[in-house]
Amino acid sequence: MAFKTLDDLSVAGKTVLVRGDLNVPVQDGRVSDTTRLDRLAPTLKELAGKGAKVVVLSHFGRPKGGPDAKNSLRQVVPALEAALGLPVAFAEDCVGESARAAIAAIEPGQVVLLENTRFHAGEEKNDPELARQMAALGDIYVNDAFSAAHRAHASTEGIAHLLPSAAGRLMQAELEALGKALARPERPVMAVVGGAKISTKLDLLLNMVTKVDMLVLGGGMANTFLFAQGRPVGKSLAEKDMADQARAIMEKAAASGCEILLPQDGAMAKEFKAGAPHRVVPVEQIADDEMMLDVGPATVEFVGLKLQGAKTVVWNGPMGAFEIRPFDSGTNAVAGLVAALTGDGRVLSVAGGGDTVAALEQAGVAGRFSYVSTAGGAFLEWLEGKELPGVKALGA
């Protein structure tokens, strides 16, 4: 879809409202992971550099529709200043007199952060009056929070209809990367989908089999597909009540010309813990008292051969219990293969989802993928083929 970017805006002397995602982890009053701030910084610095008054809006945590110190964005100010290399003023509210006064007090080229949008119950209800009050604070609206774009809230959707609107640099990068990966991909496309349950990724799987040429399944959800094929799964995590849905996905894949790749071998252990004694055997040889905690080397080799023919890879979810060693080796190995092919310019690789980012960072390859999305829910809904309200509202 067509959308405006910062290139289409004239911002000098204007007040620009930027919806960012500053919902970052805080421990002992300090931001423990600044990734989202670092990714938002280029948009804020560009606007400030062009002489705009930059006004940042964001949610933080899950307050109950009223102010509370634990969920105040004030604690994010030092980390945001460090990410920007600029001082950041703070307003005690995101609408009303305190917000107006804080914006009036800054000069063009300066930045002010407004208090948590979710301190107003109307934010999550997409209350038109709250959106109107926010819009009254500025001249232009820029959405740079793809990670919140799946929510139709006052600061992500409502406000975009009330002001000239554009995508920030992070939103632009996300939309362009995702467009290349699924909307207009170079084929063949391989999707790697892992994680514990198919029940949480049913819509995603049903959509993906119609869009991709190969679907690699890993993690606990692969066991559900193996079970649906009548193969033994021991005491592995498997949603046996989802066998019919798994068969329906396989039938839809066959009708769509999508090849499903399931584990051929695995690391079988009797208990779920780091360093648990295990053996690597073909999936058919799992014992009744064993669980498959990772894919084995034969599976990695098989996926690697298939990867040689791919031009685009979309990754969501680990291949095994990556959080406990040595059951991260399957995820690490496949991720390493994708990273190497990306580095050689042979594939475009896009990954996203919370566990996925953590797994790729643990494997040391996150920086070697073409694009790693910081969006969790929004990335998943996009993979499900759903329209994202925050993106749709930017439509040019």
Curated annotation (Swiss-Prot):
Superkingdom of the organism of origin: Bacteria
Binding site residues for substrate: D21, L22, N23, R36, H59, F60, G61, R62, R118, R151
EC number of this enzyme: 2.7.2.3
Keyword rRNA processing: no
GO CC annotation terms, alphabetical: cytosol
Keywords, ordered alphabetically: ATP-binding, Cytoplasm, Glycolysis, Kinase, Nucleotide-binding, Transferase
Binding site for ATP: K201, E323, G353, G354, D355, T356
UniProt-annotated location(s): Cytoplasm
Coiled coil stretches, renumbered: none
Short name of one Pfam family: PGK
Enzyme's top EC category: transferase
GO biological process: one example: gluconeogenesis
Pathway named in the protein's UniProt entry: Carbohydrate degradation; glycolysis; pyruvate from D-glyceraldehyde 3-phosphate: step 2/5
Gene3D superfamilies: Phosphoglycerate kinase, N-terminal domain
GO molecular function: ADP binding; ATP binding; phosphoglycerate kinase activity
Catalyzed reactions per annotation: (2R)-3-phosphoglycerate + ATP = (2R)-3-phospho-glyceroyl phosphate + ADP
PANTHER family: PHOSPHOGLYCERATE KINASE, PHOSPHOGLYCERATE KINASE 1, CHLOROPLASTIC-RELATED
Subunit description: Monomer.
HAMAP family in the record: Phosphoglyc_kinase (MF_00145)
Family: Belongs to the phosphoglycerate kinase family.
Name of protein: Phosphoglycerate kinase
Species annotation: Rhodospirillum centenum (strain ATCC 51521 / SW)
Gene: pgk
